[in-house]
Amino acid sequence: MKVIKTLSIINFFIFVTFNIKNESKYSNTFINNAYNMSIRRSMEESKPPTGAVAGSGAGAGSGAGAVAGSGAGAVAGSGAGAVAGSGAGAVAGSGAGAVAGSGAVAGSGAGNGANPGADAERSPSTPATTTTTTTTNDAEASTSTSSENRNHNNAETNPKGKGEVQKPNQANKETQNNSNVQQDSQTKSNVPRTQDADTKSPTAQPEQAENSAPTAEQTESPELQSAPENKGTGQHGHMHGSRNNHPQNTSDSQKECTDGNKENCGAATSLLNNSSNIASINKFVVLISATLVLSFAIFI
């Protein structure tokens, strides 16, 4: 009998300890499940406003995309296009014209010795450029070399002792000098006019391009200013949505729990109540089993 009593007492303690362990495990699992379920429900309730905010954010993105499309397109069309059309085109036209003009002036300079009158007539029609200083120097060098060649030829053909024949050479020198002076004056009078016209025209075109560029910037500025406002409103709505969702749920649950309606306290409280009920049931089973063991040990 003593052995049975001791065994029953040992069994009772083992059973109690086992139930306590199981109770702690179940209570911990139920508390964790309740906490996880409350978090999930709060996340599910907060998903619709976050989706709406995501939609408004997409609207802000489309607005920014529209700004990028129209603004950058306007810049590419009006700004860069104007620069390519007027700036680069003017440079290409004036640059190519400069090379052609300088070549034409070099050709007329080379032919000045043969036909000064015809070359003087050609000189206004030739396009003058920024390289007019080199062309005038070429013209003067060509005229001087041609005059020196003629004088040298005349000096060789005419004998030295005949003073009468040398007088026409002096007259020829004077006429050639006069023609050279006139030609230089004509080239100098023609060069600044065309140079001023050509130098003014390319500067006017970049000014027009610069004037067109600020207009593109002005058209670009209001759109770019409107895009951050859309983004700001999207973020503003998102912040208010995230703030307003959770406190309302907590306040409602607190009000319902303070009123005494335990059924409406929410998922977290109901699950916690269930876990506490299960723990109390386990305690009741332990007590019943203990009494039964003691009764059998005592009466047997």
Swiss-Prot record:
| 7 X 8 AA tandem repeats of G-S-G-A-G-A-V-A: region residues | 51-110
Q: What is its main location?
A: membrane
Residues linked to a lipid group, GPI-anchor amidated asparagine type: N274
Per-repeat ranges for sequence: 51-58, 61-68, 69-76, 77-84, 85-92, 93-100, 103-110
Q: Where is the composition biased (Low complexity)?
A: 123-148
According to the record, the signal peptide region is 1-20
Keywords carried by this UniProt record: Cell membrane, Disulfide bond, Glycoprotein, GPI-anchor, Lipoprotein, Malaria, Membrane, Merozoite, Repeat, Signal
InterPro entries found in the cross-reference section: MSA2 (IPR001136)
Q: Where is the composition biased (Polar residues)?
A: 167-193, 200-228
Where is this chain's protein located in or outside the cell?
Cell membrane
**Source superkingdom:** Eukaryota
Q: Which GO terms describe its biological process?
A: cell adhesion
| Glycosylation sites recorded in the entry for this protein | N22, N36, N177, N249, N273, N274
Q: Where is the composition biased (Basic and acidic residues)?
A: 149-165
| Pfam families (UniProt xref) | MSA_2 (PF00985)
One of the record's GO cellular component terms: plasma membrane
Identify the stretch(es) annotated as Disordered: 111-261
Disulphide linkage map: C257-C265
> Per the entry's comment, what about the domains?
The N-terminal region appears to be involved in lipid binding.
What is this protein called in UniProt?
Merozoite surface protein 2
Q: Report the source organism.
A: Plasmodium falciparum (isolate imr143)
Q: Which gene encodes it?
A: MSP2
